[in-house]
């Protein structure tokens, strides 16, 4: 269960949010339920939000202030034990510790594993030293940790027990001015996207301002649908769907929930081909409109042309 991401650098908060969102869009399994999201703000103060259900999409309107260069999140299925803050530890001016599996379990130090790693950091240990100490001293505990310090140093690792699993997710990139690490398990991906490679690419592009091979678009509000000789989607500069053309001879028909963003559809922006849909969106189709439905993910992945 669970995915954890920590990042440092330009727009670290956005990078983490988009990393979890991309995991929800591209993956299936233990995702899209509870979320804990933490940042060290522009003053180094620890700020945290959490929710039990709905995944990162439910934080879509979260007001992320500028100046955040240190951020972390943990997410999995819904309805985890309260308080959700136990799953992600943070301290003003010091850093954040997230993870996957059960990072809040009590370890050999008598503290929760994530809090114990944070305490080691407070005593002067680098993040990778703090994480290695926890995994070495608790080899059969069911956890992996990612620690990020306020100065940008990142450490991550799994216990020996977790490392024996055959469903692990791990991707990272650490450089002087920016870095991130992502750990997860029990999440299975769309093969067209090279799974976690695409997610890491999206995170890195946000951290550094570089271009990614893929991007996330959304049917965030009702969009007009028309009969067309070929499928197409038009999006705006922010990735929102402006209109959809359908060559499917079944439509128009009775109103209902169906695939309105279809895998392989060409995506257009400002009269230029922007890319190709990698994932689908199911929504209510009727009265000439595709309307997002609360029971379905409304974001979708696009491979750039």
What does each of the following model-derived ranges do?
Residues 1-305:
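N-terminal nucleophile
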